[in-house]
Structure formats: C-alpha cells, structure tokens
Amino acid sequence: MALPSSSLSSQIHTGATTQCIPHFHGSLNAGTSAGKRRSLYLRWGKGPSKIVACAGQDPFSVPTLVKREFPPGFWKDHVIESLMPSYKVAPSDEKRIETLITEIKNMFRSMGYGETNPSAYDTAWVARIPAVDGSEKPQFPETLEWILQNQLKDGSWGEEFYFLAYDRILATLACIITLTIWQTGDTQVQKGIEFFKTQAGKIEEEADSHRPSGFEIVFPAMLKEAKALGLALPYELPFIQQIIEKREAKLQRLPSDLLYALPTTLLYSLEGLQEIVDWEKIMKLQSKDRSFLSSPSSTAAVFMRTGNKKCLEFLNFVLKKFGNHVPCHYPLDLFERLWAVDTVERLGIDHHFKEEIKDALDYVYSHWDERGIGWARENPVPDIDDTAMGLRILRLHGYNVSSDVLKTFRDENGEFFCFLGQTQRGVTDMLNVNRCSHVAFPGETIMEEAKLCTERYLRNALEDTGAFDKWALKKNIRGEVEYALKYPWHRSMPRLEARSYIENYGPNDVWLGKTMYMMPNISNEKYLELAKLDFNRVQFFHRQELQDIRRWWNSSGFSQLGFTRERVAEIYFSPASFLFEPEFATCRAVYTKTSNFTVILDDLYDAHGTLDNLKLFSESVKRWDLSLVDQMPQDMKICFKGFYNTFNEIAEEGRKRQGRDVLSYIQKVWEVQLEAYTKEAEWSAVRYVPSYDEYIENASVSIALGTVVLISALFTGEILTDDILSKIGRDSRFLYLMGLTGRLVNDTKTYQAERGQGEVASAVQCYMKDHPEISEEEALKHVYTIMDNALDELNREFVNNRDVPDTCRRLVFETARIMQLFYMDGDGLTLSHNMEIKEHVKNCLFQPVA
C-alpha cells in the first residue's frame, strides 16, 4: 500500500509517546483464522517508530501495538530506602515540643504594648529632664543611673552583642552629653570621648543602609550641643562635615508649613529640630497616647521645651513598664502582633496557635484604619510595612479589609514608599508589599501596580548589595527575597516555605529605628527550636505514610502497568506539602490514592485503551460491577480491580467518618470524571479541535483536581452536609476555578510538547481556533491573563467562602496552588525525575532540618 508522501510527511512529528486514538491514513484487508475480516491500519506514531501498525475491525477498536512511553519514575523503593534518615521521634522531643508550645502560647497571651530592648540614646534624653519640683536634680534619676551602669567596655553605649558604628556613635554622644549636663560620671565621659574619637573616622566604612532613621537630623544637632558644652570631639572630620551638610540640605527642602500641617516622621526626631520648631504649633500634632510618634527622646525634648503634662504622663507610662530605661519607641503593639503571627505562619508552626493568632488579629483589626496603620494603635503616621503586612494577613484570615489602603503610599509616578510624602523605602517593606500584592481580588489594580513596582525594586536589590536594608538587619533577607520572587503566593506551599524560612529566620534579628532595637516576641530561639522539632516530627510521620502507600501501589499490581506514570512519591508530596498536620493522615492517603488513579486512568483513556474498552471501564464504574472485569484486557483488569477494592475501602472509612453511606457519592464523582476523559478520547479519535469555551468546560473537569478534592474532603475531620458539599461541588465557582487554573497552567507548559505528540486540543490551540487572526504568542499571553484573573478570583473565593469548613477551603485552594508549583517551569509530574520537584520531594519528605 502506498501513501501519498505529502500526507505522510505532514503528519510525522518527533516525540516520546504514541497518540491514544490514531489519525488513520489507510488500511489493508486481512483474513483471520476465525474467518472474520480485519483490517491492518497504518498511522503516524510518536515514539521511535513513526509509522505504527494496528489491527482491528474498525478504527475505534484498535489497540496500539507501540506502548506509550514515559520517563521512568525516580522514587523507586530502593531509592526511598536509601534516603531514609535515622531520625525518629523521641519521647524527649514530644515533651520538648509541648513545653515550647505552652511557652509560646504564654508569650502571645502576655502581649501588651510590645516587648523591646533598652535604647541608650532615648534613655539619655529622658535622663536630661530636670525635676519638675525645681530642685537641681533629674526628674528620672533612675535613668541617669542606668547610663552610669551600662557603659560598655570599649567606652560606648548600645547593644553589647551588635556593633553598628552609626548606632554606637549616636548613643555614645547622647550619653556623654547627658552626663556632662549633670556633671557626673567624668570617667565614663572620658572613655566615651575616646571611643568617639577612634570610631568616628571609621563610620564612613559603614553602609548607608545602616544609618538610623533621622540620623542626619539629630546627630549634627547634638554635636552642636557637645561643642557648646566644651566636649573635645573631632568636629572637623570629613564625615561630620558631610552629615552637617546633609542636614542643612534636608532642612532647606522642608516646606515651612509641612512640619505643622499633618503628622509626619519628622515628629520622630524633634530633638534634632529644636531651633526651628514652633512649640505651640507642634503641640497640635501630639499623638493620642500623649507621645510624639511613640518616641521617648522626641517626647522628652518637647517636654523640656513646653512643660506639657501629657508628655510627662507618657514618659511616666513608659518607665512604669521598663523601670530604669526606655526603648527607642513605644508602644509597638500592632507591629509585634502582626510580625509574631507572620513568623509562626512562615515557620509552619501556626497550627499550634490558632486561638492565639485569632486574638492577635482581632486586636489588630479593631485598630485597623482605611488610611493605613503604623507600628502602634495610636500612631498617627501609617507606614506601608505594617499596613501591607496587616492587609495580607487580615485578608487571608477572613477580615474585611480593602486594598485601597495601599493608595496612601503611592506617589504620582506610581512608585510605592514607606511613609506618606517621603522617598524612603527598604527591602523589607517592599518585600512585604510584594507578598501582599499576590492576595489580590479581581479588579484590584492597585495590587497589580504594587506587584510590578515591588518586583522591579526587589530584582534590582538582589543585584545591589547596598540595598540591604533600610529598616532591618536580618539573618538572610536576600534568601527571603529570592524565595518570594521564585515562589510567590500561588506557588508557595506551606511545607516548602517553612523549610526555607527555618533556614533564613534569624532568632536574633534586629531592626533599625532611630537606634537599633530588638523584638523578642518576633525573633527568638523558641520559635526556631519548635519549628525544627515540629518539621522533623511531621516529616517522620509523612515518611511512614509514604511507605504504606508504596506498599498499596505494589500490592495492587500497578507497578506492572507499563502504560502509565509511576509518580507515587511526587503525588504524595502534594497533600503533604499543604495538609501536613498529623491528624490529616487519612485525608493525605485518600488524596494520594485518588490522585494516582487519576493519573492511571488519564493515561489509560488518553493513550492506551480502545474506545470500546474505555466505555466498558466507564460502565463498570457506573454499575460498580466487578464481574465486567472478565471482558477487559489484563492491564485494565489490574486497573479496575485496584480501583474497585480501593474505593470500597475508602467508602467504608468514609461511612465511619461521615455517619452515612458515601459509596454512591464517590461513584458519581468518578462517573463525571470518566465522562470527561471519554469526551477527550472521542475528540482525539477524530482530531476534533473544539472551541475554547467547549474545551474549557470539559478540560476543567478532565484535569481531575475536582475528583481528588471531592473525595478527600470526606476525610478532613468535618461532617459534610449536602449543603456544604454543594459549596465545593461540581457546580460551585470555587471548584471550577481550581480546575480552570490547574488546566490552564498545565496547558501553557505542555501544549507544545503534546502538539508534537499529536494532541490537537489545548487552551492555546482552541483559543487560536476561535481567533485565527492572532499569533500563538498572543494566544498564550491571553491564556496567561485568563489564568491570572482566575487566580485572583480564587483568592476571593478562598477568603470569602466562610460557610465551608477551613480544612475543606484549604483543600480546594492548596490543590490549585500545588498545580502552579508543579507546572511553574514545565511538566513537573511527567518529568519530575529531572526537575526541581525532585528536590522539593526530598526536602519535604526525606531531609530533616538541622
């Protein structure tokens, strides 16, 4: 038989697999011993052999003679055994975990206005205040004594275990001025002067990003005081002259009325602006907490100039809390709560502190302001750092907050800054805005603008080491930025984020305000110790579960199936990466087994079975009839027996969990799934390219995520009524968006390879069919836009679907996210052996954290 060369050559493609239902080019009648007329069909193939011979009575009963080939699975039993660590959960670990949980719960419950460390700089300013009774003594002698007792061995004041030249120089200058004013501590003053002389010349070597807030305002002003007091300091150093020039330039740019028009960050540094401040006007900007922007030093300066009783009340309030010293700012109640919640969530230990997190967020929400929030509830100057953190966390926990709050921090050029009217921004605040921007709802253009702006800034920051950081000195802020850019919200699975943040988290991180300060309820060893113990404990349970599932796979005979992908470990990694808590072990097992069947049956319907056999398989599921297995070929017998036995067991366990029969429910879920598979097989048989809408209607089901979720949901620990099931059912928008986004990300990364293997229908190809005037690149871009919009809508469904139990919502939403991770760079399931997914599986399941 001869085939026209143009017909044959136009159909031959390279590839590793053979199309499921062939495009037939010709046939040759052949007799059989049974006397039936059969035909030999030739078709183009997709494996090493480009022309495939098939025999059958008609095209739709033709079994392939060349098996579809997939890359072999990496995670074989011997590989898993070789990676099994010696770690086991010891009773002492369990006891320590319980102790840490109790201690951290107490930490949350004791949160008041914020815990922080002493500021020698601010304490020196408070110690300056003369007694209000007219005696020639300090109003707060305990603060003066603190200065005398807390000079460091090198003659400086500040944090003993952290050295930043700017911070030490500033604190030391403030302390020697105060001691000189009170004519005490001559020895300490002299040692402080010697320190200043030796270090001031080296300060130029310090990164500009380490310069405290307002340094160029307060430092020159204090130097002027020191000179008037006769302190022998190196006033002519080039560095000092440069700082003085910066101060003068900044003051010249300052509009005369801005200082009094509305609260700004200038209120934080009034002690450095005393010669220009109108004290009567400035009193109108005093905060509700009686301070000036929560700054003890600024408030002390105002009190010494005005005698305002409210200022004195604020200082008494702070000293009542801290005793003989003051911090660099106080209160810090919103900042402390938000960052503590963020910390335990990123470390993956938040499941131990649900009530404490709710209490903390209720507190923050009760002080939420549509204009933004600052670090304290009565802080009149909002900042983008606290606001973005609050917007993201509150939204994800179901609080009603609007993204319009970010407009406060955007200038006319569309750039985002930390404080209103300023150009200051740092890596940490832009990172928090970026993280916030990914929890957008549909139509929130401000979130898209924030995403683009911050991504640009952060990518540039990675190339510029000087950009790290304006507001914080963190252990590995670069690592945090790299993770956030590579794994944004819709790709960031909880276990992967926990693993990454355990490595990046600094239990001794410090922040930069006017001086360096620490937040022990945000950065501490207890969080990190619990995170490591809990991660390794959970991972140990996961490895045991994976071994059980591997035994199920092997005992069911699935390892004998040559036509399908063996991806048991990768599939188990999916639920383990997000529904990781020990109490969801059964749910993870059901999720994994169901997912494995979706892969087996997808490969069966897509590339292996004839239409007749596929219809028989579907009918067997519909009738739930094991007797029909006798009519199936051997490999399909293995499939159906395993399917039948597994879901009978799952249904029985589901009956116990739900208190009612769930087998018919599971059957119906699978009937819908197999109908979608069958339709795709029928399309492929005749090389039919549907319209985009027709394709998506079926493909959002055939992606099989809904089947996995709808069956697994029965094991989330909740009694699911018909009403609840309907809210995540096939007709729900929530489930549809999960399937849609999963299908689109799959198609965008696989359509070219599958087209080379003979597949004719994908979101991109179907969209091009509807719009023949556009290019493939334009169609792909449009599909990405549809997916991005759907992800925004999925965010909204996840946040607002509060009638659905939390674990069910997580199940739907996280299943959508795991698809974004698997297909971020290609087909992460089929090609998982040589992709980053392999490392994720290893880190999540086999490699304990040290």
Curated annotation (Swiss-Prot):
Binds 3 Mg(2+) ions per subunit. GO terms for cellular component: chloroplast. Keywords: Chloroplast, Isomerase, Lyase, Magnesium, Metal-binding, Multifunctional enzyme, Plant defense, Plastid, Transit peptide. Substrate binds at residues 250, 470. Mg(2+) 2 binds at residues 602, 606. Its EC number is 4.2.3.32, 4.2.3.18, 4.2.3.132, 5.5.1.12. The keyword Transcription regulation does not apply. It comes from the Eukaryota. A motif (DDXXD motif) lies at residues 602-606. It holds the Pfam family Terpene_synth_C. Residues 1-52 form a transit peptide. It is found in: Plastid, Chloroplast. It catalyses: (2E,6E,10E)-geranylgeranyl diphosphate = (+)-copalyl diphosphate; (+)-copalyl diphosphate = abieta-7,13-diene + diphosphate; (+)-copalyl diphosphate = abieta-8(14),12-diene + diphosphate; (+)-copalyl diphosphate = neoabietadiene + diphosphate. Mg(2+) 3 binds at residues 746, 750, 754. Its cofactor is Mg(2+). Involved in defensive oleoresin formation in conifers in response to insect attack or other injury. Involved in diterpene (C20) olefins biosynthesis. Bifunctional enzyme that catalyzes two sequential cyclizations of geranylgeranyl diphosphate (GGPP) to levopimaradiene. Levopimaradiene is the major products of the enzyme with abietadiene and neoabietadiene. No activity with farnesyl diphosphate (FPP) as substrate. The Asp-Xaa-Asp-Asp (DXDD) motif is important for the catalytic activity in the class II active site relevant for the cyclization of GGPP. The Asp-Asp-Xaa-Xaa-Asp/Glu (DDXXD/E) motif is important for the catalytic activity in the class I active site, presumably through binding to Mg(2+). This is Bifunctional levopimaradiene synthase, chloroplastic. It comes from Pinus contorta (Shore pine).
